[in-house]
Regions:
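N-terminal glycine-/serine-/threonine-rich beta1-alpha1-beta2 phosphate-ribose binding loop
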Residues: 2-162, 179-191
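A generic structural signal for short
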Residues: 68, 141-142, 172, 198, ...
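Predominantly a Rossmann-like dinucleotide-binding segment in NAD(P)-dependent oxidoreductases
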Residues: 71, 76, 190-196, 200-272
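Short, solvent-exposed turn/loop segments enriched in Gly/Ser/Thr/Pro and often Arg
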Residues: 99, 125-127, 146-150, 171-173, ...
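ADP-ribose/adenylate-binding Rossmann-like module
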Residues: 161-173
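Rossmann-like NAD(P) dinucleotide-binding subdomain of oxidoreductase/dehydrogenase enzymes
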Residues: 175-177
Length: 272
């Protein structure tokens, strides 16, 4: 092997260095909630390279924002708490889900953990709940329903001029993808903010590692493989009285028509 070629040992050594560098990324990336206040929050972007976001610890204070949550299960609840932790002046004002028990679980969590109360008349159930949440005077929505439903929900939010946090995956089939892309162009034309839940793309250690790679730390990358080894996320036993549809939706991660299966639903993080 020529000296300029990258050996396995050199590669492992370099990736260990990158891992160590990633641990100090929070100190390297500017924050809009602390420090000397000189940061202009300019995204880190190089000519010809793809967008690399700046990752502040907390959002800049501004006017109060009213937020609606569409899909109040585990991911919707988690994203809602994440949002409240990440910024001041956030008020969750509307909740929507096919199932009332999901809404009540999130209401209780908001009440107990964040001292926020969502009024009865602002809680909506059924397959049209997303429309009622979006029409309830919110500034932005968290869209965390099963992936198959997200294109239609995002399309409606965009039509109504509402900003969106859209969980990944954004779609599970070509039709859904085309719906998303058409709505995205409309959102851009309207000046709406749209963020997707691709966590690797927004994780400080990964961002810092990418910066080191782009700087040439491990040399030219000519190829690679992406792996994700994992067992079952979870499984919902069918309960007496559940219809086929209710069982599918409550157990959505295990049904390809709703989740897109492992590559689309989970492995998309690492592919991204």
């Amino acid at each position: 092997m020529k000296e300029k070629d990258l050996s396995r040992r050199k590669f492992l050594t370099s990736t260990a260095i990158i891992g160590a560098a990633g641990m100090v990324a929070p100190a390297l990336l500017s924050s809009c909630s602390g420090g000397n206040g000189n940061s202009k929050l300019t995204p880190l972007k190089q000519e010809g390279e793809y967008y690399v976001p700046e990752l502040p610890d907390k959002a800049i204070d501004g006017r109060e924002l009213k937020v609606g949550v569409i899909g109040c299960g585990g991911r919707g609840s988690g994203a809602t708490i994440n949002l409240l932790d990440a910024a001041n002046g956030i008020k969750v004002t509307a909740l929507g889900d096919v199932f009332a028990d999901r809404i009540e679980d999130l209401r209780a969590r908001l009440r107990n953990d964040k001292q926020q109360e969502v009024a009865d008349e602002m809680c909506f159930t059924g397959f049209d709940a997303y429309q009622k949440v979006i029409d309830a005077g919110v500034d932005m929505v968290i869209i965390a329903t099963p992936p198959a439903f997200r294109p239609v929900h995002f399309q409606y939010a965009t039509e109504k001029g509402v900003h969106s946090f859209l969980e990944k995956p954004i779609a599970v089939d070509p039709k859904g993808y085309r719906t998303i892309m058409a709505a995205a162009k409309q959102a851009q034309a309207k000046g709406l903010s749209v963020v997707t839940g691709t966590q690797r793309h927004h994780e400080r250690r990964y961002v810092e590692a990418n910066k080191q790679i782009q700087a040439g730390l491990i040399g030219e990358i000519t190829g690679g493989n992406v792996y994700w080894n994992q067992g079952m996320l979870w499984y919902k036993e069918r309960q007496p009285g559940w219809s086929d549809m209710e069982w599918n939706i409550r157990d959505w991660v295990n049904w390809t028509w709703l989740s897109g299966d492992h590559i689309v639903e989970q492995h998309v993080h690492n592919i991204d």
